[in-house]
Amino acid sequence: MLEDGVIVTLSDNAQSQIDIYDILQLLNELKLAGAEAISINGIRIVNTTDVALINNSYIKIDDNRLNSPYIVKAIGDPVKLESGLMQKDSGYVDKIINAMDKTAIVERNDNILIPKYDGKMTTKYIEMGE
């Protein structure tokens, strides 16, 4: 089912590369703005998703190596998501991206499809119910 939300495209440029902190900050900002589901380059992000920088050379999500551009899709109220990212001086795009001369494009979209999570959910302290 297609849903409303935003698509954020993060791209490296000649002067600066998107790094893991840019990705993590974007995920946090989207969650704070009310995102109900998020994916990066087609990989569903859940509360147990492992986002890591490997050898200071690439970003890995769970077992998937990612390269720029990073296409981040978020389902939720597109107005709230966009305004949360675009706030002057305190929003993600102005504070993180523009200040560091990186490239980010934020677009509202009403045809977003985020795949189901296909990884294994592991728990340490709870057991599955019957």
Feature annotation, model-predicted:
Residues 1-130:
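Core subunits and conserved enzymes of cellular information-processing
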